[in-house]
Amino acid sequence: MARMFIRQTRTNNKITGEGYFTFRLVRGERIAGKVRQITVLNLGRHFPILQDHWPLLCSRMEQLLAPQSLLCALDCPDHIERAAQRYVAQLIARAPSSPGAGADAGAGASIAGADTASADQVAQVDQVDQADPVGAGKTAPPAPASTSDLQTVDIDSIEDSQPRSIGVEHVALHAIAQLGLVDKLTQLGINGVMRACILGNLIGRIAAPASELATWNWLQTESALGELLDVDFAGLSHMRLYRASDILMGQRQKMEAHVFGAVTSLFGLTETVTLYDLTNTYMEGQSELNEAAQFGHSKEKRSDCPLVTLGLVLDGSGFVRRSKTFEGNVSEGATLQVMLTGLQALPGALVIMDAGIATQANVDWLIEHRYRYLVVRRGGVRSFDAAQSVATQTQGGETVRLQKVMGADGKELALYCHSEGRQAKEEAMVQRFCAAFEAGLQKIVDGLSKPRTEKSVTKVQERIGRLKQKSRGASQHYQITLTPHESGKTVAALSWKKELVQGSMASHPGVYCLRTNVLDWDEDRLWQTYATLTDIESVFRSLKSELGLRPVFHHTQERVDGHLFITVLAYQCVQLIRTELKACGISESWATLRKTLQVQRRTTTSMRRADGHTLHVRKTSKAEPALMRIYQALGISASPGGVKKLVV
């Protein structure tokens, strides 16, 4: 093998005339009787290795490419070893594709230019006109007829190296191509470096949810995404990922509108149902620089951490139409008008929301802006007549009985719903609250017969008041009587009588009421439509548990907003994938699908041939049956990245 060395060349900028140095890895090769210097790899302008270490770096690379050429391992500093491993991996990844090796051999066309071997080259890629980076999302053309490549190798010399995950990345790129995200980012004037970093952030959140710093490490050491995009993430600073988040936040409204428009076109969605709800997530640290980070009621029981609130407007299919970040202690009812203003929903669109948001002021606003609404009624008296009800079934097979009652003004109706499962739950709650309240009353009674206990009328009334305050509504069902002594200053006896208040949880367990101005639907259609609101809960579970919404590690409001928005975009991609898979009978959660996809790896196998040369083969592992089923359902290649061969 011809020895390699590093050449430094001075180049002048054609526009400014400014001079600068570029670095290339070259080797000597005899052509037509003359020795020519052949560029093996462009190392860019900002090559970080000192000149004194160039020979050591080249020797280590030669050893990695042809292990038999050096009998003992070289003692290299850590930064030299990392650089050698990185550049050797690039040489193998950029080797010519094997004919007939796979339909996706060239699917990883660079989003950032033809050659992104270094950070400097990546910095220049926005000057290169690019096509679709992935090629995923379209059925791959048939591969050419496979040709045999028979070679004699030493079996004992076989080594595997550079294992990287590729399955999740491949499917995520399919979703990104379906949504046309790269074209949209290009249209918005975002250069190739930032496009690559935005995709790195997004796919990292889909495949291995973590902070930007952890994602940067994942892109370099665990993922083959760089190969699919032809981007050298090892040549990029981790700060690029943070800046990519900032740039993406600057285009939030345009990106949300584009993504929802894309899924509407792909799946033929009808914009007739709008779901709205909020959730919150907690911060790591005090986040003193973020005004939105406030202490409040944490849905994860993290009252020790400041919170931020995420509001989502979704359509009936579970895709996000709009998202916005609010303060952690925001009142739910105060957010609706902010989210729906300017939404440009179709006339008569139906808004569904729970009781926390369905204030009378919000209902009046919906009526004023000609929305239809289907909401959970806040408060009010419970009522239900089983004889006037009809039955329906939930997806879980539970029976729910429905009674429709027209309002006095004829403009709104109430749908009273009775659930057997909810009845059992509420009966247990009422029993527990009443038992605790009666135990508190009995404790007061026991104290009246003991010496040195407080028996004054005023103090006993205060104790009863505190007991009522903690009773969670159970006290309303009790009539309490205090019998004072003749002096009127102390209590002689205390008694109580339990009488259920009609129209309450105790008298009508399992009953809740929906209110709507949709008057021409039957009971079953109204309830089944309202039941789609439970889809938001599954969305929030996916965002938090599967896509890394919590916790938030950032301290400034802009970075927190960026973290949440990237998570929402990741959810859109996952929802697209799951929607396509459901149409083919695959309905697993994303956590389950991700485990199946993560099994597939891309590795380099090196072996010594009979002629003394070393053969390096970069190839993706064969898809297992469960994974193959996913690829076939999505219509994408089962061998992303193809096969690359390099003989040294």
Regions found by a protein language model. Give the residues of each.
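Glycine-rich, N-terminal phosphate-binding loop and its surrounding beta-alpha-beta segment
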Residues: 57-102, 112, 123, 129-131, ...
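Anion-binding and metal-coordination hotspots
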Residues: 3-6, 15, 21-24, 98-139, ...
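Extended interaction-bearing regions that mediate binding to partners or small molecules
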Residues: 1-82, 86, 97, 101, ...
